[in-house]
Amino acid sequence: MTSTYPIALVVGSNRRESLNRKLAKAITRLDAPTLRFQDIRIDDLPMYNGDLEAARPAEVNRFTDEVRACSGVLIVMPEHNRSLPAVLKNAIDWGSKPADRNVWRDKPVAITGTSPGAIGTAVGQQHLRQIMGILGATVMGGEAYIGNKPQLVDEQGSFADDTTRAFVQAYLDRFATLVGKLA
């Protein structure tokens, strides 16, 4: 019998019409029978402040409890100024504190994203990989930079072209294998 693993789906954007939210939706529509995606909100988290660690806000507890309950994390992010978005870095910081409650440690993490710039999310993903590695996450090797095309995702929320669909499906299959090995 094949297990099904809950996967925290973290979209590193707080825009309502985010390209990455659309990308995330298309990813969840792919064939991944062993993965069950849970959309984890990060836009309601207060800015990280060490003074709040002792009496953590309810939104922070909700976020960390949801991530902790998942077998892996898929982060879908834009790139801001050649790095990761502040809203995502804030969520990562809350998830890592205090150190003995770090939700990222030993957690399988896959990273992808799209941005309108010429190099997409290449530099931002490298920054995120470095941060997640320092926090003890098991970051899946290989890159998944998704070029932003006018028709990346169709009106039904699926990938508009077979090449992108096949590429992302292969990446998702590798992630499912990693999660299965580490869960």
Give residue ranges: language-model regions.
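Secondary-structure boundary/capping motif
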Residues: 16-19, 48, 83-84, 120-121
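Short connector loops at secondary-structure junctions
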Residues: 38-47, 144-151
